[in-house]
Amino acid sequence: MSKFVPYPLFHDDMPIDISFVFESERPAGKHGFMHTAGDHFEFEDGTEARFWGVNFNGGACFPSHEYAETVADRLAKTGCNIVRFHQLDAEWDSPNIFSFSRGKRLGSTRELDPRSMERLDYLVYCLKERGIYSYLDMLTYRRYKTADGVAAAADMIDSTKYPFNCFDERMKELQKEFMSQLWNHMNPYTGLCYKDDPAFVMTEIINENDLFSKPNFTVEPYTSDFRRLFRAWLDRRGIEFDAEGCDLTAKDGVLAEFKTELEREYFAEMRDYMISIGVKIPITGTNWFFSDALTRAHVDMDFMD
């Protein structure tokens, strides 16, 4: 006799269903907006928030209506209560938030594709109805175009390899524009803008990209811009240091202090912007921690992922 119990994992169903345990938690958002309370998350009505969930990557964030219902049911049966929407802006997958289908080359990344958004809206609605919350990434794999007004866009085929999003003014403007478009988007199925829907509980500013783990300063004018910012920072503090000739990837204490401060300012600027447009949920900077310096840069954030 076999010692193993069959436990098949179907793509459209589950061999068990424990969704009845969480029936009283439907719809997601019934307890109000989530916030941080000391060392834990809490909803407006005082209910402590705890989550167990999954990532949806790239095109998986934009399923057909039929599959959105199927996958929401499947997740609910397992007791899953949160989905992180990741790589929404990934050009290498289709659909993505800027383009519903492959074909004509995108001239810019400054508009959300209405067909992609309609599918995302319905998926968010299906999850919400089953008591499943949503976590939204902001910047992940966005590939800037020349028409976006980004210098040397053609030289950065994979923008995730470079740390320029953290200090370039044009890239920061584009990030804010994207945030405004997404958070102010009205979901016709819930009747709420994303920023006004308590089914969204967390967000992060940028995925796996920072001045410490992505020390690739090989593209101009960004290398010169970074050295200019570094030199001005040194001058304000009266520190003697070779800002022009130093290795920008070196593990130097002075350079690390500057990067930490610059990263912290970037996180604060993006957080403050989201708050200014009405985002009400906890915000973090990025979702990984390669050094104590990067951890220190999160001191003003609501949580650390």
Predicted segment positions?
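N-terminal pre-domain segments of enzymes
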Residues: 1-31
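Active-site mouth of glycoside hydrolases
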Residues: 29-304
